[in-house]
Regions:
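Flavin (primarily FAD) cofactor-binding/catalytic cores of flavoenzymes
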Residues: 2-65, 133-631
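Redox-cofactor-proximal catalytic regions of oxidoreductases
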Residues: 54-132
């Protein structure tokens, strides 16, 4: 197609696979390819394409500030398949991140011999032990490592894979961005930003988040001439352009905001110091160059902190949900609202009652068995009211779902209202195993993955997917995928230092000649800088990059249809992850994995967790098998 880079060009002579994106998924695909081959296999060339650091990828680059931390715990992430995994190629046992840290410290007698042997055969770069000395010494399984340290782990895994490649696999590294893909008969021609071309018999796109084109409001923001920090991952945003010493408006109170908060306080020389007299437990000592944040979001309330258990989080029983999944697995047109949500909600309230009975048994005014009978007989939206007369500490999940809805006070009053709730959030998170509220919320949070698997590939009704399911997934994100506790303590310390204020939920924006104005209910605030501290979901229908537009224009992808309604994800074939054309035919060579396919496949943003048969590693294994099948056909 003229002008799109999708035209037809001449032939090719050698079998080759192109992996676009050399972060965790790209690494895993290379390892899964290697697991399927040996020195005597027919030779192939694998082109490794990414303008970011190969192995780490953009998000986990090792040269970034150590101020930013993972949202995942050290003992809950791996990149190696494990014995018993649902994969076709042989397993390569390797240390999870925390075991790798233990081995760096000279510990790990309880780590399996196979993992220790792999580590000893491939010792990490010597600078890691020195550069991360303090962090390595302090890290526990439940710690949140710096993103840079996780990048070092990924780079080590990548180096292990490269070193262990059979002689039949040769690799070529390209440190450039893919711009377009053209079909040339039986091959793909990938044009890179540096002007080079890669010719491939099979291609996989494993590139993570892709930014869509600006919507109408964002086009106005871009044309305003004012200081607007557009939505993106914080490592891609120009946080240095956020001015210190003046008001800054923010939209977003999730992980993106917490990153921006850290980068404009700690990274600029401010300090959070322990202070037992402060309600957050911290006192902020300003550097003078931090912004004065005025913050809003869809809910208007900050993401909740993760609990501190002193160990990895517990696995909740969720007995009702497990029963529902066993009954409904694979069934089309499941109504999430009517058939799944009641089990999730009742499991959550059972977790509350069970923990309350354990830590404060006198709080139950009726026997636990009687309360559970009421839970099972009550509409899920009425559970809080139903159990209230039976306990001395009533709790209603609805209060958290709509924490500031209808609040009519001014910014000062709302800020204090939220600050008091944050103080409670901090207290509950610090209680760990002994918080009934956190037990209830963790039960709901852990229900998200199995519920999303149950409804994958459009198995939930369209109405329930866009309704209750979407609501529950969003709420679960806020209560279960929030920051480490220390980040929420830091935000409350900023509130008490007069440097963070809350505007409210569902803000509306107006653009004036010299400032922006955000309004939420009766509250409004103006400033010359607006930070959008969130990320849009990738959407191939409104792609902001030439490569995705090229694929759409050339008919190599189509939106995944959810009950006839197009979504933002490219549709892919389950067994192979090959893309689907508008006419329903599978593409001969092109594969897409990971985050962009969120509408069709579950759990696309979650790192592989040890002991869970991670879906990401199942996907990369399937994809590697298909890539080899394509080049050998």
């Amino acid at each position: 197609m003229e002008g799109s880079g999708c035209g037809t060009i001449g032939g090719m002579s050698t079998p080759a696979i192109a992996i676009v994106g050399m972060g965790p998924r790209g690494i895993s695909i290379l390892e899964r390819l290697s697991a399927r081959m040996d020195d005597s296999s027919d030779p192939i060339t694998v082109h490794l394409i990414d303008d970011a650091q190969h192995g780490a990828g953009r998000i986990w680059e090792t040269d970034q500030t150590k101020t930013l931390c993972m949202n995942t715990r050290a003992g809950a992430v791996t990149l190696f398949t494990e014995p018993g995994s649902t994969v076709d190629a042989p397993v390569l046992e390797g240390p999870i991140q925390y075991e790798w840290i233990q081995l760096l410290r000279g510990e790990g007698d309880d780590i399996s011999a196979a993992k220790r042997e792999l580590f000893e055969q491939h010792p990490p770069a010597t600078h890691i032990a020195e550069d991360y000395r303090e962090e390595l010494a302090a890290t526990r399984p439940e710690s949140n490592p710096s993103r840079a340290l996780y990048g070092e782990y990924l780079r080590w895994v990548y180096d292990v894979i490269i070193t262990r490649l059979p002689k039949s696999i040769s690799t070529v590294s390209h440190f450039s961005q893919l711009e377009t893909i053209a079909e040339d008969g039986p091959v793909d021609v990938l044009r890179l930003a540096d002007g080079s071309e890669v010719r491939a018999d099979a291609t996989v796109l494993a590139y993570g988040w892709m930014v869509p084109e600006y919507n109408e409001q964002e086009k106005q923001l871009a044309a305003s001439g004012l200081n607007w920090i557009a939505p993106n991952n914080p490592v891609e945003q120009d946080y240095a352009a956020i001015p210190g010493g003046e008001d800054v408006l923010v939209r977003g109170l999730g992980m993106g905001f917490y990153d921006i908060m850290a980068l404009t306080t700690i990274e600029r020389g401010g300090a959070f110091v322990e202070d037992s007299s402060a309600r957050s437990g911290l006192r902020y000592e300003p550097c003078g160059d931090e912004p004065n944040f005025i913050i809003s979001s869809g809910r208007g309330y900050p993401y909740h902190p993760k609990s501190e258990y002193g160990e990895l989080p517990p696995t909740m029983p969720r007995r009702r949900l497990k029963k529902v999944i066993a009954e409904l697995s694979g069934i089309q047109d499941t109504d999430f609202d009517a058939q799944v949500w009641p089990a999730i909600a009742r499991d959550s309230y059972e977790a509350y009652i069970t923990t309350l009975e354990r830590v404060r048994p006198d709080s139950l005014l009726r026997p636990r068995a009687d309360i559970l009978e009421v839970i099972d007989a009550t509409d899920p939206d009425e559970l809080g009211a139903a159990i209230a007369p039976m306990v001395t500490e009533p709790w209603d999940m609805n209060d958290l779902m709509y924490q500031i809805a209808g609040f009519t006070g001014d910014i000062v009053e709302l800020t204090e209202h939220i600050a008091q709730s944050m103080e409670s959030d901090i207290r509950e998170a610090a209680a760990g195993h002994d918080s009934p509220i956190k037990a209830a919320l963790w039960s709901l949070s852990q229900s998200r993955k199995p519920a999303s698997i149950l409804g994958a590939e459009g198995r939930y009704t369209r109405e329930s997917r866009t309704g209750r399911y979407s609501q529950v997934m969003s709420f679960g994100q806020m209560i279960g995928s929030g920051p480490p506790l220390f980040r929420v303590r830091q935000l409350l310390a900023l509130v008490d230092a007069g440097l963070a204020h809350f505007l409210g939920d569902h803000p509306t924006l107006s653009i004036e000649a010299d400032h922006f104005t955000l309004t939420s209910g009766p509250r409004s605030a103006s400033a010359p800088t607006l930070v959008d501290a969130f990320m849009h979901r990738p959407d191939i229908r409104t792609a902001g990059d030439a490569m995705t537009r090229c694929l759409v224009d050339s008919g190599r992808v189509r939106p995944f249809p959810d009950h006839g309604q197009p979504t933002g994800s490219p549709e892919t074939d389950g067994p192979t992850r090959r893309t689907v054309h508008p006419d329903g035919e599978l593409d001969a060579r092109l594969h897409i994995v990971g985050i962009p396919t969120y509408s069709q496949w579950p759990d696309t943003t979650i790192s592989p967790m040890p002991g869970t048969d991670p879906l990401m590693l199942q996907e990369t294994d399937k994809t590697a098998g298909s890539l080899l099948a394509v080049v050998r056909s």
